[in-house]
C-alpha cells in the first residue's frame, strides 16, 4: 500500500512538473515568432483564449467523470468557480454590463440603470458567496495539503500564483505607471495569455490528483 501510494504520488508530481514545464516552454517558444504572428495568436478570441475556455470545459468534464456524485454535489462551489473563470475568460463580466460587474464604477456610475445595478449586485454577491465558501470549507485542507506537499493542493497553489501574476501583468503600465517597449509589451502579453491558460491546466491536475489519492 505504501509503495503504491509513493508511486502514484511521484507520477502525479511528474504531471505537475510537466505542466509547469509546458507553460514555460510555450512562453519561450512564442518569443521566437514575429510581432504579427504573436498578435494573431494572442488576440482576443484567438487560439490561446479559445484553448483556455476549452480547458475549463475539460475540467468540468473531468469532475463529472472522475468524482463521485456525492463529492460533486457537496463541493458544488468548486464547479461554480470553474464556470465563473470560463465566463470571465469570455469577458462576460464586461460584455453585458456598462462598466463590468467587477469594476467599482459599475455600482456608482450614473450611466448604469437601476435594473442593471440590481443584477450587478446579485451577480457580485453570488461571486463573493462562492469565494467565501471555498475559503471557509477548503482553507484547512489546502494549508495542510501544501504543508504536506500533496499534489492536488500544490496544483491549486500554482493556479493561485498564476492568477496573481496574470492579474498583475494585465494593465501593468496603467496600474504602475511603467513604460514598456513594444517588445516588452508583447512579452508581457505572452506571459499573461499563457499564464491564464495554465490556470485550468492546474485545476485539471488537482482534479485528477484527488481521484488518484483516493484510489490508493
Role assignments for model-derived ranges:
Residues 2-21, 150-152:
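N-terminal membrane topogenic signal
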Residues 90-147:
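Membrane-proximal helix-loop-helix units in multi-pass membrane proteins
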